[in-house]
Amino acid sequence: MENMFRLMASEEYFSERRCVWVNGPVIVGAGPSGLATAACLHDQGVPFVVVERSDCIASLWQKRTYDRLKLHLPKKFCQLPKMPFPDHYPEYPTKRQFIDYLESYANRFDIKPEFNKSVESARFDETSGLWRVRTTSDGEEMEYICRWLVVATGENAERVVPEINGLMTEFDGEVIHACEYKSGEKFRGKRVLVVGCGNSGMEVSLDLANHNAITSMVVRSSVHVLPREIMGKSTFGISVMMMKWLPLWLVDKLLLILSWLVLGSLSNYGLKRPDIGPMELKSMTGKTPVLDIGALEKIKSGDVEIVPAIKQFSRHHVELVDGQKLDIDAVVLATGYRSNVPSWLQESEFFSKNGFPKSPFPNAWKGKSGLYAAGFTRKGLAGASVDAVNIAQDIGNVWREETKRQKMRRNVGHRRCISVA
């Protein structure tokens, strides 16, 4: 509280914007990472404020995902701390089921985010030793003053739109990002080019083919495609189990052998594997292997055509680097997402320029001066849950110690009053 008085004494404090003192941390982002952190803080008895730029929790899931989406991993690897999925949920919950789970999660732990508040800047005030988080909402500015700041905006805050020659200036067809794609129904009978071959690109291509779109998918570089299940068991679960006992290179070797037995060779279909194994590549770069849920069948049947990198677009065509020209009506950019942290967090010691913590897992959750990060480990919802537990315990330890000291001071003061009387 002394820090708060020191801040109020400065002229800058008395500005036109409204200021709010937060006893506990401010959590930026009401996605799964922010909700998990808030729930763990609630369990520790620590107050908090969650600010969210959208008008709902988990806005990526609610507003920027396609209709057919399901979790690609079994539900036990995707549940948040302190609340499992309902027993009646399938092994791979649907998008709607996952959203319902998150809403129930927020209700259970009394998480009430302050919606429609976009964080414009957050900086640590050296004079007061406090964080100053400035937000805007409908033109109104507000500043939150807090001791702890939890960055939970995630790895996928902003879509990535690559610069491709002629795409935005020459091409006359429809161009959308995968975050705007809902269903292949509107593209029935049309010639659609999907740019990107990650999990989203593969599933969008599958959905388009299922709706009888004439589908081509750009594959510029090598990619690991694994079956979602091997002999009825989750491929991810098998890899997690093996990594407990075996070195990473051997896990990769076994995974690739098993994948070859299930899927066969993919090189004849234009899908070349990287030289580095899938788990090692994930560990080194964060690049997730594709878990096949049906796209390979469409590729093998010719319903989805694999094409090389793009050279340029013209009015109704795309020219590829191998000289091919394709007639197309629409383009879906399955080109991924990025962190937006550098655009608003005024700090360079903990976060790098790409918006991810500089320290590798498992030390990427805590910075200095009360700064924390949840959900930036490139290890999915399980990694975000580990971050949330660590952050809440760390803040909770300080909170309980200070609460204990305050009670002791009050008790001493109370005894003095009695003795004087």
Swiss-Prot record:
<comment type="function">
    <text>Involved in auxin biosynthesis. Belongs to the set of redundant YUCCA genes probably responsible for auxin biosynthesis in roots.</text>
</comment>
<dbReference type="GO" id="GO:0009851">
    <property type="term" value="P:auxin biosynthetic process"/>
</dbReference>
<dbReference type="GO" id="GO:0004499">
    <property type="term" value="F:N,N-dimethylaniline monooxygenase activity"/>
</dbReference>
<feature type="binding site">
    <location>
        <begin position="196"/>
        <end position="201"/>
    </location>
    <ligand>
        <name>NADP(+)</name>
    </ligand>
</feature>
<keyword id="KW-0285">Flavoprotein</keyword>
<dbReference type="InterPro" id="IPR020946">
    <property type="entry name" value="Flavin_mOase-like"/>
</dbReference>
<comment type="similarity">
    <text>Belongs to the FMO family.</text>
</comment>
<dbReference type="GO" id="GO:0050661">
    <property type="term" value="F:NADP binding"/>
</dbReference>
<dbReference type="InterPro" id="IPR050982">
    <property type="entry name" value="Auxin_biosynth/cation_transpt"/>
</dbReference>
<dbReference type="Pfam" id="PF00743">
    <property type="entry name" value="FMO-like"/>
</dbReference>
<keyword id="KW-0503">Monooxygenase</keyword>
<keyword id="KW-0521">NADP</keyword>
<dbReference type="GO" id="GO:0103075">
    <property type="term" value="F:indole-3-pyruvate monooxygenase activity"/>
</dbReference>
<dbReference type="GO" id="GO:0050660">
    <property type="term" value="F:flavin adenine dinucleotide binding"/>
</dbReference>
<keyword id="KW-0274">FAD</keyword>
<dbReference type="GO" id="GO:0009635">
    <property type="term" value="P:response to herbicide"/>
</dbReference>
<dbReference type="InterPro" id="IPR036188">
    <property type="entry name" value="FAD/NAD-bd_sf"/>
</dbReference>
<comment type="pathway">
    <text>Plant hormone metabolism; auxin biosynthesis.</text>
</comment>
<keyword id="KW-0560">Oxidoreductase</keyword>
<feature type="binding site">
    <location>
        <begin position="29"/>
        <end position="34"/>
    </location>
    <ligand>
        <name>FAD</name>
    </ligand>
</feature>
<protein>
    <recommendedName>
        <fullName>Probable indole-3-pyruvate monooxygenase YUCCA9</fullName>
        <ecNumber>1.14.13.168</ecNumber>
    </recommendedName>
</protein>
<dbReference type="GO" id="GO:0009723">
    <property type="term" value="P:response to ethylene"/>
</dbReference>
<keyword id="KW-0073">Auxin biosynthesis</keyword>
